[in-house]
A protein has these predicted regions:
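Ligand-binding loop in jelly-roll beta-barrel domains
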Residues: 194-218
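Short glycine/proline-enriched turns and hinge-like loops at secondary-structure junctions
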Residues: 143-144, 161-163, 180-182, 201-202
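Glycine- and acidic-residue-biased ligand/ion/polar-headgroup-sensing regions
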Residues: 152-155, 161-177
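Alpha-helical membrane-targeting segments
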Residues: 218-232
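Short alpha-helical interface segments
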Residues: 2-14, 20-28, 33, 37-106
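Conserved short histidine dyad/triad with adjacent acidic residue
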Residues: 117, 130-162, 189-195
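A short, N-terminal "cap"/entry segment at the start of jelly-roll beta-barrel domains
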Residues: 88-139
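Short acidic-glycine-tyrosine-enriched beta hairpin
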Residues: 177-197
Length: 232
């Protein structure tokens, strides 16, 4: 199935297979908290994504309705009671735990409201670049982090690549990179295989919601020095 993104928003700029996978994992509760929050905002902005998410949620609900109850054997029930009584929980690592959703940061409709995000408290990193942290620690070497990034109109970002994945949702303004223009409502997906230097569109500061798995990898020595201080 493919999604046709025809709406007042600009066309979605990452491969549809990536979007479909993200939405399906969102509907199934398989996304990490930061990814979950970002996709939730994208769904609020884009009616096509919202429709696809609703479809996947309905399919999941239908599958659950078709599950037939199975009687449990006394032996199984006894084993469960024994575990509860003597405090030996099953420590099974599960990256697909639906409880991730419960732990996700609250996604306010304010994040997709231009006036609200422009009037948030921002921490200046360098002239023309500011950040508003939402989840995680940008200065740690590893670990998912979610933040709002605001960059002045017309500014060119330093050339960089990534450690792991970066998901970005444009909330205001836009930028150009690799021959493409990303504007409000667009999702942009990057990883360590690509190096780029986005240029912010003229006329309006660019604000995006960004999820990264680790700090950016700057290509030049001066941005590297600055990064050690400000973190991003």
């Amino acid at each position: 199935m493919s999604i046709q993104a025809h709406s007042p928003l600009s066309d979605i700029q990452i491969p549809m297979s990536e979007i479909e996978t993200a939405i399906m994992n969102y509907a199934a509760g398989k996304l990490t908290p930061a990814r979950h929050a970002l996709i939730a905002c994208a769904i609020e902005l884009n009616p096509d994504l919202a429709e696809f998410a609703a479809l996947n949620t309905s399919v999941a609900a239908s599958l659950l309705d078709e599950v037939k109850p199975v009687s449990l054997s006394p032996l199984f029930i006894g084993k469960v009671l024994e575990t509860l009584s003597f405090g030996h929980p099953y420590d099974v690592a599960n990256d697909h735990n639906p409880k991730r959703i419960m732990n996700a940061p609250p996604v306010s409709k304010g994040l997709v409201n231009r006036d609200v995000i422009k009037n948030m408290s921002w921490k200046s990193l360098i002239p023309g670049v500011a950040v508003h942290d939402l989840l995680g620690n940008r200065k740690t070497k590893n670990g998912e982090r979610l933040y709002l990034l605001k960059v002045k109109a017309g500014m060119r970002m330093p050339e960089h690549t990534h450690q792991g994945e970066e998901w970005a949702l444009i909330l205001s303004g836009g930028y150009r990179v690799d021959g493409k223009t990303y504007r409000r409502g667009d999702l942009h997906f990057e990883n360590e295989t690509n190096s780029h230097s986005p240029v912010i569109c003229e006329g309006e500061d660019c604000i995006c919601l960004a999820m990264t798995e680790a700090p950016l990898v700057m290509k030049n020595w001066l941005p590297k020095l600055i990064q050690r201080v400000v973190g991003i």
